[in-house]
Amino acid sequence: MATITQPKVEPTTLSNEEVLRYSRHLIMPEVGMEGQQKLKAAKVLCIGAGGLGSPLALYLAAAGVGTMGVVDFDVVDYTNLQRQIIHTTEDVGRKKTQSAKETINAINPNVEVVLHNVRITSENALDLIRPYDIVVDGTDNFPTRYLTNDACVLLKKPNVYGSIFRFEGQASVFAPHLGGPCYRCLYPKIGRAHV
């Protein structure tokens, strides 16, 4: 069985405020100073700022990821508010990316948030994903999941995938460039009923 390793990111120094902020991480042997420095140096692309992307972005910000790209083309709707916890009532009608950026920076002003207020397509997927170390797929449809997977495979980027359906959830890390399968390896064909 192949061993999956961490993405290669250069450690960076932490300020005194960051040492205090991340002190609970720093005392964990699995993270420590080196791990926290790698988190700060990491560039993560979060595709989707909805029901799954919202908590993903919040936890990544709280954990201290240094740069987070947020991809979404939609605006906040009242029907989003009960599950898309990164948005508030005051955000209704605003772009999800802008709402997400403000909440992320309210939680952790040290995170550089890069907004991609677009729909991910076959024309822009490679350019969107290329600058990042790892992709977090918080999308809610199969065509976008396959597109994200294919771009990550081509660019040799780890793809952290998650999905939610009612009270069930799935999560996986796909890194075929490190010897594991990809999303398309597990689900080679999409049924017409799911498109």
Predicted regions and their residues:
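Adenine nucleotide-associated cytosolic modules
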Residues: M1-R192
